[in-house]
Amino acid sequence: MPNPYPPLQAPPRLLFGPGPSLVAPRVYAAMTQNVVGHLDPFFFEVADQVRSLIGYAFSTANPFNLAISGTGSAGMEAAVANFAEPGRKFALLSNGFFADRIGEMARRQGAEVVRLAKEWGKPFDPQEAREFIRRQQPHMVAFVQAETSTGMYNQAKPICEAAHEAGALVIADCVTSLGGMPVLVDENGIDIAYSCTQKGLGCPPGLAPLTVSPRALERLKGRAAPVQSWYLDLALLDTYYTGHKYHHTASATLFYALREALAMVAEEGLERRWERHRRNHLAFVAGIEAMGLEMLVAGGDRLWTLNTPCVPAGVDDAKVRQYLLDRRGIEIAGGFGPLAGKIFRIGLMGYGSTGENVMLVLEALGAALRDQGYQAAGDGRAAAEKALAAAV
């Protein structure tokens, strides 16, 4: 009788969606190291390296850096659960899906959520944001630096300056910026920032890097009510990672992977890494526009990690994505919410942000569009090659 459960063999995939992204062989190799216990001295040695490297990746001198056991949404919930308080005003700047998720979490904490909303993919006017924060006088301000639903990069500094003028602290979602674009926690004045592992860091999902400023830690100590989440209580987590007191069973394997991915970030250097992402993003956009497609987000507001070209008229985005998966083993994503069927979300981030992958995705996307009857206006690969050559 044949074995109904033979050894697992996952299909090969080229991950060019909004995450997870491609993982470097070096990171995979780290995950094959011996598993140790979550209170083993070696585990804490690795965890200490991870905490230091998280500070480097976020461009911060904050001593409080953690990797939360959970995905980026766990990082979001940790930030909100510790700093949103019942009855206190929580100001949300929203121009995409994930900002509204922050708001939902804050409401569940009992905070009074007030919202400045923009159309998905449209930037905030700095003066309007400043006036909104001044008028509301909130306890906390939250925004998404890199909005994964739209490919939008929101400028942090004006928001943080306005929040601090009002006496508020700032939470920033850096899920799709960390490791691929400048986050600059200290320079921008971000008080609490969180991210994930499976995008710009090029690591499998499962941990959420988080950093907290000394000013925010003082606020946390003065909470009127206990943090409602035991698992995500930052004070308890700190006793685990710095005091080596049991809290939960952290995954040694995921910490090995994150340690290696962050070490690769440090070896490359943040500025060089950002420039690599910027160069490949610009080449990809040059190719997309040469093919006759438009980008959802205006030039200066685009993410370098996640590209959002609009779906041409008459093209079924789901069929394009299925073609890429079935014929090329390539995963990209579509839009959702008000952008469902209107955009592609194509990630070139972390280990996957290379000139070769720019060409690969442009060629494959062109073939998928032709299969739908779309005739490109020009040669996307040639335009991308020209952009890459000009950037050298």
Language-model region placement:
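A glycine-/small-polar-enriched, mobile loop at the entrance of the PLP active site in fold-type I
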Residues: 12-69, 73
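Active-site C-terminal subdomain of aminotransferase-like
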Residues: 22-23, 198-286, 290, 392
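Active-site phosphate-binding strand-loop segment of PLP-dependent enzymes
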Residues: 123-179, 192, 200
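Conserved active-site segment immediately N-terminal to the catalytic lysine
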Residues: 185-198
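Conserved PLP-binding catalytic core of the aspartate aminotransferase-like
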Residues: 294-327
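PLP-dependent enzyme catalytic core of the Aspartate aminotransferase-like
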Residues: 338, 342-392
